Amino acid sequence: MLEFIDSQLSSWPLARANYQALGKTERRSFEIGDLRVGVQFNPARIVSTGARIDAVSLAARPCFLCSENRPPEQTPVDIVEGWQLLLNPYPIFPTHFTIASSVHRPQEGFPLDMVEMAEKLPGMTVFFNGRHAGASCPDHLHCQAVMTHELPLMCLIEERHKLLSSETSGMRVATAVDLGLDSPVGFVSVIVTPDMDGMRQLARIEETIGKKYIEEGLVNIFVWKDSVGILRIVGVPRKAHRPSSYGTGIGQYLVSPGSIDMAGVIITPRRDDFESLTIDDIRRIYSEVGI
């Protein structure tokens, strides 16, 4: 994958400039309960954070994930049947991919192909924004992938939700409460054992995470293989797409939480928001959009 990234950056000036800008990215940190939350100042992400996602706006613009509308420099890699891996030209982290469906179809359901993607991307977490949970392109099915160590919530869950030696088969499920965590983000953590029983139980994953939230597009889903090769799936159910404070007016913040924000890295494209966000503001944002 490093060769793919290098090749894209050498031939694509826009992406190269945005990845180089990451080296100057500013960040603040807050300890909120057991979760260390980062706030990143990233002006390039205004494309996503400020995206208009109403039906009229979507219909009025060409879909930027369809192959015919992509920049000519954006070269796809067929990662899993029916899916193409693309370098994200507006990155949050130094390794940041978009994985788009080869066919234009809505951002719906739980794409179980994410499990195979995670197998193909060791060290990375594949994540999915529900259409009402941070998706800036809800008319075209897609996932994204970043390095797992960049996501505080995933690191915390790996540390606290472990597969016991006595638990040898199937699926193990825990919430923040079950794990004794003081987390501003509610979640359902699933460990899938690498055997037939575990694979069979994957068929019930929607019920485990919350079928209602998946059907309503109010969920963020994360899939990865941990450091010992165990498959992990985390669902973060949502009750809102954006907090009441979303906007550009006085006392408002241009913060539109997607998976990365819910995983503990809040993206702020405006400097004023980056500098003025407080721990109470962050708690409020999480409480208004999460469960």
Give residue spans per PLM region.
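Active-site microenvironments that recognize anionic phosphate/pyrophosphate groups
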Residues: M1-D113, F128-R131, T148-I291
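Helix-hairpin-helix/helix-loop-helix acidic hairpins
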Residues: E108-G109, A118-L121
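Active-site beta-strand/loop microenvironment that shapes enzyme catalytic pockets
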Residues: K120-M154
